[in-house]
Amino acid sequence: MIRLIKILFLFYCLATVSFFQPFDLVSAQAAKAISYSLLMGLLVATCLSSVSKRKSNERFRTPMVWLMILFGVACFIPTLCNFDQSVLQSFSVTLPFFSYALYFTMHRFSFNEDFIHKIIFALAICTIITHIINLITFPVIIFGTPQDEYDLSRGGIRLVMIGFSFVVLSFFITIDKWLRTKAPKWGIFAMACYIAIFLSYTRQHILICTFLGFLMLFNHVHWYKKVIILGLGCILVMSIFPKIPAVQNMIELTQEQNERNRGNETEDIRIQAAKFYGYEQFPSLANRLFGNGVFTFKSAWGRQMQAVTESERVYAVDVGIFGFNWSFGIFSIVCLLVVFYKAIVVRSQKYVVGRYYFIWLFVSSFASGALLYPSQIIVTVIVLYLIDTYNYKRLYLCGLKSA
């Protein structure tokens, strides 16, 4: 049974990245149908499992349970508010968010750390390889769809990187492994992940990952090495990075956007989106607390919202945490903040990788859709489980030593 659950979990992870869509053989709709079926199967298996006792190492249990309840409430909001969208339609489009419940699946069937790391590394490697192939074959898109957006204004080809969050997580894990073991393979893997992050040409991710990567190195070495790392970092930032053509283009693009925003009466597009999803579009206090629900383009309300967002050019994926707030309300945001707090701030949380990942997730969620994509949700769930596993193992070993 456990072996079958692990296979289903692996295939679900692949489905969240649409199986990398080679030559568009697996359409987005087919991948979505497969992922929905796998997710439902995993959740049903979790509910039917004979193991019902609460485990002591589920530190995120309470906020995750409340998130599931609030997601369920959100399925009824559009119908109760007469938004012209049925409960069934709302459930079908909200279902990917229930993948947060896979946190309980992983605990229920006690996934081992090696299995999880293999999934993370395999998908990160596949992401890097497929992205490089797409860059080489551009404008022909081999992995993905021809409709995927691209941008040539940043000194390189900015393409959609399927499975990006697996690369980010692998970046932090491999740095941690290299610091602990000094094995060259982990250092090489970390560099490959960083290069892939840079090739995404997404400014906030490059800046955040660069800063956090240096911080990981800085916090794990002696003081004299800290001075060396700090010096090298200053040299890179002040002298080398600005001379890289892609970096120059991204700096110039940022300056142009700032000048354009100052010259125009209209605000920055992300500030407009943050206002739209943060506090402007809530018909009542109940909607502010519980959200508006998730809309689907198959409903009249969804088509109306699509027209509004297109005309005003405000997109939830540009301001993920505000988009999450719009769909699920303040109570859900509070649950998320509790998760962030337990993963980042609480001193008993000793899993360094988890802390750095959640710092990246929290900061990037203000300017990307990091909380909204299924492929990023599943990575977040994996990290939550790894935090629990690492800290429980650490407490167990401490107990053995003191006995």
Region roles according to the model:
Residues 1-255, 310-401:
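Hydrophobic transmembrane helix bundles of membrane-integrated enzymes that assemble
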Residues 28-31, 239-276, 287, 299:
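Flexible juxtamembrane loops connecting transmembrane helices in multi-pass membrane enzymes
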Residues 264-328:
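Long extracytoplasmic/lumenal interhelical loops at the membrane interface
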